[in-house]
Each structure stands twice: as C-alpha cells, then as structure tokens.
Amino acid sequence: MLNPNKIIKEGDRVVMYNGKDNMAVLTMESNNVYNSKFGSYRHKNIIGKEYGSKLSSDNGNGFCHVIAMTPELWSITLDHRTQILFNLDISTIIFNLELKNGSRAVESGTGSGSLSSSIARTIAPKGHLFTFEFHEERVKFARKDFKDNGLDQYITVTHRDACGKEGFLRQDINNDIDAVFLDLPSPWDAIENAIAVMHDGSMLCSFSPCIEQVQNTCLKLADSKFQEIKTIEVLIRTFDTRLQEYEELNLTNPYIDNNNNNNNNNNIEENRGKFEIGGIEGLKKDKLLSKPFTEARGHTGYLTFARYLPNA
C-alpha cells in the first residue's frame, strides 16, 4: 500500500477499476486470470505495466484501469467485518490527533482496519501503531490484511479487551504514546488504561454514535486531567449549482449624454435609439447560483477530542 514503485510487479496488490461502484482487489500472480463482466485479464499481461494504465481485455472488447492500492480505496473495497469509519471522519481524526511521521499511536478496536491503514500511512516510516481488538477472529483477519497490504511493519495487532486489567500495557510501550483512539461501546471505561501509556500533551479521540456516550466520556475526561475537550460531528453538505439568467436593473437615463453637458436634440435621439435597440435583452446576464440538495448522508458518529495535561 505504501509502495513507491510506478511499475507493477509480481506479488503487488492492485485495484482493477471500472468505476467507483465496480472495483476489485487483486494480488498479482503471473499464472492467474481476472474474470469480470468487462472481460478477462491475465496477470502476466498486467505485470510490468505502469500504475494507472488502461488495459484491454484478452478479447479486446472490454477495458479497465489498474491503479495502486491506497487506504481510501481499501476502505471502499475491504470486507466489512464491522461498521467502518469513512474517509471524512478518518481525515478529521488524523488531523486533530496531530499524527505525523514518527508518531506512536494506540487504537481500540481494530475492526475492519480502515482507520488503521490510514494511520499507518500517516506515521510511516518512523512511527508505529498498536491496535487492540477483543474479537479473536477479527484479529486474525486484520493481521492478514495488514501483511498483504505491506503495513505489518508499521502495525502491531494485539488480541485484548482494552477495558480490561492489562489495558494497553506492552513491553514495547512505555508512556511514549502520542495519540490514542477509542471506538468502544463504553470508552470511559478505557480512559484510565489510556492514561497509563500517554505522556504530557498526548491527544485522545473517542468515536461514539450516541450523544449519551459522549456525555459520559466527557465527564470522565474532565475528571482525569484532560483539557481542550471538544466534540464535533462531521457531515457532507452537497450543493447543486447552475447558471440562471437574470435581468440587471438599468438606472441610467438613456436620454442624457453624461459625456457632454450641452445636450442637444441629436444626443437625445442617438441615446434613445441605443436604448430601444438594446431593449431588455441587452441587460440580461448569467449568474451562478447554488442550493443544497434536499437529501444528504446522515449521522455517523460524534468525535470527542481531548489533550492530556496532568500538570496543568
């Protein structure tokens, strides 16, 4: 997924793209064939091509584009083992957690790995993500996905209940975590465990679908020496735009020549002719108008952010 190469090689994971609603993830193996309603494509004919190439099917009747895997495309094409976070929330989380190359982060739970992949790209190559998941089957799938996408060196998956006694403690974590993300039914129960691995100034984010969860989380954060507590909801509002013809009001007197104070009958007749020839049509213009669509994507969840400042 973080492959900088422009040329497709054996073993690369690619996306066969035929539109936003028709994508397939493939691992390049020279002996395999990809079959779709747009035709058949032999992997050996794809290997060696540049990412972004337009490919013709074996019979020449169809085509598709082969593009490199990204966390955004992975969020669209992955198997939804759980409800996932989408790109709008993910970008907001990464920005407000102040993640960057070299950051060390903790996440719970792992789920389908959508957010994990985006965090890994942000903190690579010097940073690391420790993600915790209580569901053993999801842990196995996540480890396989991260390995297949080339992210396993940046992500460590642990099978554990983040609200339990051990929490986020590991031998390779020692109060050096820069950011913690919680996507749990009761995130307030994991805040003490989060504090155990955070340092002064670390950021915490909690994702909760219900406002009652937000209220309990904020109360716990306020009692646990967190500052700068805020909760936001991110929604897309799409606008429809179009050009509208309208008539501009003409406030000038057509019978007066402003360039000549000594008006005469010739000026009056000349200006009257110009106005009558142009008429109303000569005053029409186009203006760009917009209005929001009546239907929009609804609520996903609330994002609560806070900074740990124990000495403040």
UniProtKB/Swiss-Prot annotation:
pH-related activity note: Optimum pH is 7.3.
One GO MF term: tRNA (adenine(58)-N1)-methyltransferase activity
UniProt KW keywords: Methyltransferase, Nucleus, S-adenosyl-L-methionine, Transferase, tRNA processing
Keyword rRNA processing: no
Coiled coil segments of this chain: none
Catalytic reactions of this protein: adenosine(58) in tRNA + S-adenosyl-L-methionine = N(1)-methyladenosine(58) in tRNA + S-adenosyl-L-homocysteine + H(+)
Subcellular location(s) per record: Nucleus
InterPro entries: SAM-dependent_MTases_sf, TRM61_C, tRNA_MeTrfase_Gcd14
One BP annotation, GO: tRNA methylation
A GO term from the CC aspect: tRNA (m1A) methyltransferase complex
Enzyme Commission number(s) of this protein: 2.1.1.220
Activity regulation behaviour: Inhibited by calcium and magnesium ions and spermidine. Enhanced by KCl, NaCl and NH(4)Cl in concentrations from 0.1-0.25 M. Concentrations of more than 0.3 M are inhibitory.
Binding site for S-adenosyl-L-methionine: L85, S112, G113, S114, E133, R138, D161, A162, D183
Keyword tRNA processing: yes
Recorded family membership: Belongs to the class I-like SAM-binding methyltransferase superfamily. TRM61 family.
PANTHER family for the chain: TRNA (ADENINE(58)-N(1))-METHYLTRANSFERASE, TRNA (ADENINE(58)-N(1))-METHYLTRANSFERASE CATALYTIC SUBUNIT TRMT61A
Function description: Catalytic subunit of tRNA (adenine-N(1)-)-methyltransferase, which catalyzes the formation of N(1)-methyladenine at position 58 (m1A58) in initiator methionyl-tRNA.
Assembly and interaction partners: Heterotetramer; composed of two copies of trmt6 and two copies of trmt61a.
Protein name, entry field: tRNA (adenine(58)-N(1))-methyltransferase catalytic subunit trmt61a
Organism, scientific name: Dictyostelium discoideum (Social amoeba)
